[in-house]
Amino acid sequence: MIVVVKNHPYSYDVENLAEIFFPYEKIKVLSQLPFDTEDNILAVTEMSADEIRVEARVFEKVIIKSEKIGKESDCQNIMSVLFYRAFSELLGVSYPWGILYGVRPARFWHSLSDKYSKERARNIFEQKYLVSPKKLDLVARVAENENKIISLSQKNSFSLYVSVPFCPTRCSYCSFVSHSIEKAAALVEPYVDLLVREIAETAKYANDLGLRLESVYYGGGTPTALSANQLSRVAKAISDNFSLSTLREYTVEAGRPDTVTSEKLAALKSAGVGRISINPQSFNDDVLAAIGRRHTVRQTLDAFALAREAGFDNINMDFIAGLPKDDIKSFKHSIETALSLGAESVTVHTLCLKTGAYMVTRDNVFDHGDIDTVNKMVDFSREYLSGAGYVPYYMYRQGKSLGNLENVGWSKPGSECLYNVFMMDETHTVLAVGAGAVTRLKNPVSGKIERIYNYKYPYEYISGFDTVSYTHLRAHETPEHL
C-alpha cells in the first residue's frame, strides 16, 4: 500500500489508520505518487489553505472525501476522520474503536475525565474518535476498576518483574523473545544462576532507596518451563533479598499446562505465590494442534485440578479470539468451560499477528478467523463474563490485531491482577530482571518514565552478564529518579 502525504504533518496518523484497514500490507509513505507504481491500494492525503482531501483507492474503486477548514479547525482529527470514512465506505467495513489507536485506551480515558468530566470524555471518544457505544461502556468500566487498584500504590511503591524466556515449544502466533526448552536446554541452568545474582543485585538498590514492593510477576516465556528446584531457587533469591512485608500480590505464569506438575506447584506455593495463570488459549484440541501448543484439553483440566489441590485459589486462564480452526461455537465452549471450572479471572486476547510470528513468516499465509467472527467472539466474552459477575479491570490494544480489537482481563471482584494494572498504567517503577526484561523507572514528581533494556536473548544475557548486567541501575541511585 502507498500512502501519499501532501502538505501536512499528519503522516503518523494516516499510517496508523492504514494499518488498521490493511494490517498485513507493507505501507510506504511518500510525498508523491510514483508514475510506475504497481500497488493496487492507494491513499492520497493532502491539505491546502482551506481544505483537507483524502482519496482512497483499492484496485478500480475510488472514493474521495473532503472538508473545508479554517483557523480554528482541528486539522489532525479531520484528516483522520476523512481517511477512516473513505476506506470504511470503500471496503464496507467499520471498526468499533473508530480512529482511536494506541495501547492504553483506559489511560486516555483517565486523562480526559480528569481534565474535563466523564460525560465530556464520552463525547470526545464518540464524536471525535468514532468509538462505538459498546467500547465506550467497556473503557469506562475498565477505567473505574483500574482506579481502585491504582490508588493502592504509594509514592515509593514498585513492582518486580522476573523474565523466564523459555517455553516447551513456540506457538505459531508468538513473536515474543522466548526459546524452546528442547533447543536451549543447555542455557537454562546458567541462566537461572545469573538470574539469582541479578535479583540480589537489584534488591540492593531497591532496599537502599527504601522502595516498597507491591507485586512480583514472573513472565516469559513460560516460567514453569523451569524445574521445581530452579523455581525454588529464583523464589528464594527474591525472599532472601527483598522485603516481602508490603507485598500485595505474587503471580507466576504457569502458562503452558504441559509444564505444570505437583512438584512445581508445591514449590511455588511454599514460596508464597498466591496467583498463577494456566492458559489453555482454547478448549478445542484441533485448535491447539493448529497453533502448535502441543498440549491437550485433558492436560489443561488436569493442571487446573492439580493447582486447586495445591491450594491455589486465584487462577487466571487466557484465551485468544481468532485462532485458526476455531469458530464461535468452539470459542463459546472454551469460555464456558473456564467459568465452569471456577477460574477467578479470564483474560481474552484478540489474535495479533506480529512480523516474527510463525503464522506470518511461513509463506506469508495468514490463517485466522474472519473479522466478523472475531467480533462476535469478543462480544460474546464481554456479555457472558459480565453476566457471570466478572468485571473488566485491565485492557490494552496491539497493532495488527484482528479487527483492531482489544485484550481484556476479567476477574471476580477481588481477584484482579494488580501487576497488570500497575504495569499497563505505568503507575510506579517496575524493576525487571532477566533476558528481554525492561525496567521502567518512574519519577514520582514529574511522572516521566525512563526505560532500561536488559539483554534481549538468553545467550547474550549469559555471555555478557559480568560486563554490564544489573549495573544499569547504578546511574539511578537517587530517589528523584524513582
Report residues per predicted region:
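RNA-binding accessory domains that recognize and position tRNA/RNA substrates
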Residues: 73-114, 133-138
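Canonical Radical SAM [4Fe-4S] cluster-binding loop centered on the CxxxCxxC motif
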Residues: 157-192
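Short Lys/Arg-enriched alpha/beta "domain-start" segment
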Residues: 1-35
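A C-terminal junction/extension of Radical SAM enzymes
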Residues: 27-31, 36-39, 356-433
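Conserved small/polar residues in nucleotide/adenosyl-binding loops
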Residues: 471-480
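Short, well-ordered secondary-structure micro-motifs within conserved domains or adaptor modules
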Residues: 25-64, 68-70, 79
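N-terminal [4Fe-4S]-dependent radical SAM core
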Residues: 90-94, 114-160, 209
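Conserved non-cysteine loop/helix-boundary elements of the Radical SAM core domain that shape
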Residues: 178-381
